[in-house]
Amino acid sequence: MQNAEAAPALLAAHGLVGRRGGRRPLDLNLRPGQLVHVRGANGSGKTSLLRTLAGLLRPRRGEVRWNGADIHADLPGYYLHMAYLGHDNGCSDALTARENLRYALHVAGAPRAEPELERALRDWGLAAGADAPAARLSQGQGRRLALARVMLSRKRLWLLDEPDAGLDAASLQRLHGMLDAHLAGGGAAVLASHRGGGAWAGCTQTLELDEYAHAEVVGADCLA
């Protein structure tokens, strides 16, 4: 993979101001192999920023671009490359854990990748209850299932809002490994979390939000 700083930006935000306005615009460039860690107090706009980058909200001013093109010019095309995980896990309660992951593989164009599916169930500690409805999963199990879906999505860009919520120490370690592998393969991620910058291996930028879109990039590199 080419040096991240030399590569063109995959995701770029220019002059971004949230719907509340009144704050300094945000500029962001995310390149292959980079992770941006978004931090801020509750109500600072972390979720609004992630939803704006995902195309679910329109900014008051500014634009979000994927590979140089405004995401709102072709949202379906953008969604072919982007996986978004919000506070809701986005899994079907009516389907089993295995069926949820099988659907993720189908959407990713790899419907026959059963070994990959079974490995994900084992790695995330979901194998024992894989054939029970997802509605029966605990909060932590539901979050692990959602992360396994993101991992199997094969999307180049991950937008993760508090992905560590409800995770135990072993699952948190697995999340770190998942992010490391994604970045090493040329992927990119924006992650909102209350954890300190050094907690995320591979983190190349930390975005400190006061109020959206008052943001400041601090530190060129926060590798753990």
Curated annotation (Swiss-Prot):
GO BP terms in the entry: cytochrome complex assembly
Catalytic reaction(s) noted: heme b(in) + ATP + H2O = heme b(out) + ADP + phosphate + H(+)
Residues engaged in binding ATP: 40-47
Pfam families per record: ABC_tran
Membrane topology recorded in Swiss-Prot or TrEMBL: Peripheral membrane protein
Keyword set, alphabetical order: ATP-binding, Cell inner membrane, Cell membrane, Cytochrome c-type biogenesis, Membrane, Nucleotide-binding, Translocase, Transport
Subcellular localization, as worded in the UniProt entry: Cell inner membrane
A GO MF term: ABC-type heme transporter activity
UniProt KW Ribonucleoprotein keyword: no
E.C. no: 7.6.2.5
Chain ranges of the ABC transporter domain: 1-220
GO cellular component: plasma membrane
Predominant location: membrane
Its biological purpose: Part of the ABC transporter complex CcmAB involved in the biogenesis of c-type cytochromes; once thought to export heme, this seems not to be the case, but its exact role is uncertain. Responsible for energy coupling to the transport system.
Family named by the database record: Belongs to the ABC transporter superfamily. CcmA exporter (TC 3.A.1.107) family.
Subunit and interaction comment: The complex is composed of two ATP-binding proteins (CcmA) and two transmembrane proteins (CcmB).
Protein name as catalogued: Cytochrome c biogenesis ATP-binding export protein CcmA
